[in-house]
């Protein structure tokens, strides 16, 4: 753990903060938010911070502290010393949601008395979608809008009309610059490394276009099922749950033009240009699937048409990407849990190589980003096998974050995003314009979705996904040598 006060200047927020954590006893708060706030506080990122928990549970302050300590003991990835816990516990307060806006207003006022000078408020709404607007209105009734920012969890609507309506309701209370729509995928270090990789190196950006790139895959299969989210998942499905809020945001990082600076406004504008250039999604370019047994699970309609799997092809119609297909895939109960982006380069002429040389036998050259927490980047290419004759093997160059001395400096996704929200940095957050633009492009799919196709749990989805990507192949599971360079050529 980084000693308090050792954080580089400018990394933390400018002002002390009161964090109002709505849904403070829920699953996300226990797994990610409370451990994240503990680490940010004790590591010196937010040395002046008070946290007010709010939930439907009828607790007092000591009861909430027990919940918080249990969350740290079960889910914290860092050591929790008694001294650090005592300091963190002293910063906690609690207000039952049933106590109303006036009780919350009083608790925030008490917390702010601990600070000298100006302070700010961060409201984190870790609540179900149907409760978000009522919480926003409660914050308005409590006069907690001024000097505040609000963080919201997905989904941000379920189609264009609902997204427009949601944003209009939010803007009745908060200004757009106060609203932070969270995407924890973009908070992960590997996702942020995409921007550094592209724009800090002269090697790849000149070939980052349709002249050199054949296609791009963004592949996020999950082995997990629904867990406790059956009721929520049944109303949204894989497209609304994962593609709009996560995969399209990653696509924007991959496809955007260089911003004028790595600041929130220029980056958001370039992302929105990508969304504006996206062609409407054709239902014929989409495969929807549902794993066998889904309809028999508790809380699921026995005749459900909700997809637990989706694969699609989309296009960005601009000078950089016209004609280059982007293939996206995600789903529940699949063969592996992975998060990769794979860029397939155009293949060179092959006739100069003799028959049997192996040229092209293992697919095109690939640049692959592994978005797991280990943060790997791999470049695969052909090279000559030692010995007589011209025999080619697929070789690989790899980089992994754990190979550097900085792996201990990595913030978890929610930690980074909380810190950014406190600083007013929208770089890794989604705007109202971006969300509404994506729902507009998705309208043809939402209006006329293709039928769901069954697939076996533990598989890679319905077999028809291979027709979707033909004549190419999915990077997973067919080309695996890039994952372990020590096995290459064997």
Predicted regions and their residues:
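Secretory/organelle targeting and membrane-embedding segments
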Residues: 1-152, 156-490
């Amino acid at each position: 753990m980084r000693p308090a006060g050792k954080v580089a200047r400018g990394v933390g927020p400018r002002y002390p903060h009161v964090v109002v954590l709505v849904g403070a006893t829920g699953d996300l708060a226990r797994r990610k938010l409370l451990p994240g706030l503990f680490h940010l506080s004790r590591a010196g990122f937010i040395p002046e911070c008070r946290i007010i928990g709010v939930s439907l549970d009828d607790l007092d302050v000591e009861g909430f502290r027990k919940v918080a300590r249990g969350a740290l003991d079960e889910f914290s990835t860092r050591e929790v010393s008694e001294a650090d816990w005592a300091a963190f516990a002293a910063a906690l307060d609690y207000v039952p949601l049933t106590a109303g806006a006036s009780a919350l207003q009083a608790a925030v006022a008490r917390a702010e008395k601990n600070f000298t000078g100006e302070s700010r408020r961060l409201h984190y709404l870790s609540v179900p979608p149907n409760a978000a607007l009522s919480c926003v209105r409660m914050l308005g009734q409590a006069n907690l809008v001024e000097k505040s920012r609000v963080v919201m969890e997905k989904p941000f609507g379920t189609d264009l009309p609902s997204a427009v309506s949601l944003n209009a309701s939010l803007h009745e209370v908060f200004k757009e610059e106060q609203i932070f729509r969270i995407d924890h995928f973009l908070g992960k270090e590997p996702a942020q490394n995409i921007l550094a990789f592209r724009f800090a190196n002269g090697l790849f950006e000149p070939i980052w276009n349709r002249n050199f790139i054949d296609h791009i895959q963004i592949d996020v299969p999950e082995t997990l099922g629904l867990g406790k989210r059956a009721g929520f998942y049944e109303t949204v499905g894989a497209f609304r749950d994962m593609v709009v809020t996560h995969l399209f945001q990653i696509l924007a990082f991959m496809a955007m033009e260089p911003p004028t600076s790595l600041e929130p406004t220029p980056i958001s504008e370039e992302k929105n240009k990508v969304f504006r250039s996206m062609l409407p999604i054709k239902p014929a370019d989409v495969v929807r699937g549902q794993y066998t047994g889904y309809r028999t699970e508790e809380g699921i309609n026995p005749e459900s048409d909700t997809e637990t799997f989706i694969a699609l092809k989309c296009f960005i119609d601009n000078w950089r990407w016209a004609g280059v297909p982007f293939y996206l895939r995600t789903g529940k109960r699949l063969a592996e849990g992975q998060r990769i982006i794979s860029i397939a380069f155009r293949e060179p002429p092959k006739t100069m190589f003799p028959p049997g040389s192996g040229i092209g036998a293992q697919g095109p050259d690939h640049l692959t980003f592994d978005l797991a927490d280990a943060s790997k980047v791999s470049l695969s290419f052909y090279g000559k096998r030692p010995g007589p004759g011209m025999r080619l093997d697929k070789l690989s160059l790899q980089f992994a974050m754990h190979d550097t001395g900085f792996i201990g400096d990595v913030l978890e996704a929610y930690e980074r995003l909380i810190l950014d929200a406190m600083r007013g940095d929208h770089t890794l957050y989604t705007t109202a314009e971006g969300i509404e633009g994506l729902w507009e492009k998705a309208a043809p799919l939402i209006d006329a979705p293709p039928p769901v196709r069954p697939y076996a749990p533990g598989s890679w989805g319905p077999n028809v996904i291979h027709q979707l990507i033909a004549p190419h192949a999915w990077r997973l599971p067919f080309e695996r040598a890039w994952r372990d360079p020590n096995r290459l050529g064997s």
